[in-house]
């Protein structure tokens, strides 16, 4: 099989796999589509078995880390952390939609950074719906904030997003160094979102005519907070003590899951589902498909397009092209394709890629799996959104957030 034919076939398989992930037909799980696509490419010779195995081994630690963080997030839900966050938002806002939006911004940013964007989408969004209903105010600004902050605030830590984990392992940065470099870009992106949201949703943020009763002071679940503190401290010290962060994540998952099993407040089957094995298998299959595309010439094409320098102009170009690519093929395959190229060019290009693939997906529905998941959460709440409104909001936030975050990344790299 010629390289051109192999690349064309691989891109076709990638397109079909992503279409299944977006549409999620009940008769064809996304994991099955990705695995079938990867096996097919091995069978037709588009990628050798050894290269496919290498791709799976390279993704192994990332997959293990993600599974552990999903279990920690599920444990925090079970311990009542998200319900406490909802009560805190309702009490602190005092009936003001503007203050409620501020609380949602802060809490969504923190949850995204610490527990991952999936926790914000799946666990916080329903709480926001309930909180807004209790306050008798429109939930639209706050629900949109969950979607946008899940993407924009996921720049901060390696654990915040699967895309970050992929870049983290490729960049060879320590956990603390990664967070230090991405702190200012994250603040910049969130600040842009806040400014735009206040103006875009001005009519929805008017004070309601009737304020609901003020909720009682919430009590944070101390055990869940302690597990999170232990896990994050372990991440911060991982490079100092010479232990991979995945082991601290595994310890945190065990610490919050084993007592629940002992108390019979959960079961092994429930825990297995919480780890989302279907999604993890999908990522592994997708990794093989993207690797097949890379070895058949896609990496050469990417290298020809992306700058390799770390000047402000280069970083802006990398972030912009990464955002465009994420909205064309979704940010997960975009990261798998782009990070090996940009990480080889240095820390700056690799992190600029993350700005593009994390912030950029707020522009369209298909830009990230988190946004697609957010739409499914809205359907369970009998809520829908207007495509035009979503696109207008993205057009206002994404370019400005990309610019601000990339400029501050460039400044952070100079320190």
What are these regions (language model features)?
Residues 137, 176-219, 359, 363-366, ...:
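Juxtamembrane and boundary regions of transmembrane helices in multi-pass small-molecule transporters
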Residues 6-17, 26-47, 59-71, 123, ...:
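Hydrophobic mid-bilayer segments of alpha-helices in multi-pass membrane transport proteins
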Residues 2-12, 57-71, 113, 117-121, ...:
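Structural signature of hydrophobic alpha-helical transmembrane segments
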Residues 188-267:
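Long, contiguous bundles of hydrophobic transmembrane helices that form the permeation core
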Residues 49, 53-140, 279, 284-346:
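Membrane-embedded alpha-helical segments and adjacent helix-loop junctions characteristic
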Residues 112-122, 139-172, 193-198, 326-339, ...:
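Alpha-helical transmembrane segments and, especially, the helix-loop junctions at the ends
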Residues 95-103, 133-146, 173-184, 346-356, ...:
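Membrane-interface alpha-helices at helix entry/exit sites of multi-pass transporters
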Residues 1-6, 25-28, 51-62, 173-185, ...:
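Interfacial loop-to-helix junctions that mark the boundaries of transmembrane helices
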